[in-house]
Amino acid sequence: MELYYYEDCEYCPAVFETIAKLKIMDKFTCKDIRLNPYYAKELKDLTGNVTVPCLVNEQGPMKEAKDIRKYLASHFD
């Protein structure tokens, strides 16, 4: 799975806290869209914008932190 984020995002820490709590960090490729402009382009091509956090799994992109956390808890807890 891929997780698009940037460090100053106010919603990203909650997603990272859930990932840490579930001990599943190894399941992600984390892509900071501010450190790597190519990641921002990937995200824009995929979703039409550069809103983060964005989790991409086999079903496609998921954009809301609340939805991402709920998905992670239901699939990895």
Label the model's feature ranges.
Residues M1-K27:
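Local sequence-structure signature of Cys/Sec-based thiol-disulfide redox active-site neighborhoods
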Residues E10-Y11, P37-Y38, K63:
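Short alpha-helical
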Residues D32-N49:
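Thioredoxin-like thiol-disulfide oxidoreductase module
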Residues L46-V56, A65-K66:
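Structural micro-motif
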Residues N57-D77:
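Non-catalytic, surface beta->alpha helical segment in thiol-disulfide oxidoreductase systems
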